[in-house]
Curated annotation (Swiss-Prot):
Gene coding for it: mraZ
The keyword DNA repair appears for this protein: no
GO biological process: negative regulation of DNA-templated transcription initiation
Protein name: Transcriptional regulator MraZ
Database matches in SUPFAM superfamilies: AbrB/MazE/MraZ-like (SSF89447)
Subunit structure: Forms oligomers.
Amino acid sequence: MFIGEYNHAVDTKGRVSIPAKFREELGEHFILTKGLDNCLFIYSSDEWGILENKLKQLPMTNKDARAFVRFFFSGASECELDSQGRIRIPANLREHALLEKEAIIIGVGTRVEIWSNVEWEKYNSDDNLSYDEIANKMAELGI
């Protein structure tokens, strides 16, 4: 399981270090794709396979399902770590996540997310999140 929050620099070639705690669980090859909320998602090959199977089951006749599948797969890139534990984030994905010099890498259970430090701060602002509202919604879901 991926947990925690880490700050890392993004170099001029678009490379960022993946926290050592995440590397082993991700394995040698994994998938980087566009995420929601202006971030990127990283899935291990196993988790990607599970998600891929679920997405394949969506009805092609549903416009929203087609749009989501396109969004998710068109932004996907197979990745592997270099000898220094870094990945190179393609330009289109850096643009999607508004990544510049600093990245926040967080563990979110079955996936890793990469955020620009600016977007992460905005997301976590009091104006954006009400933890009481979120807690109430989770209670409605039985959590």
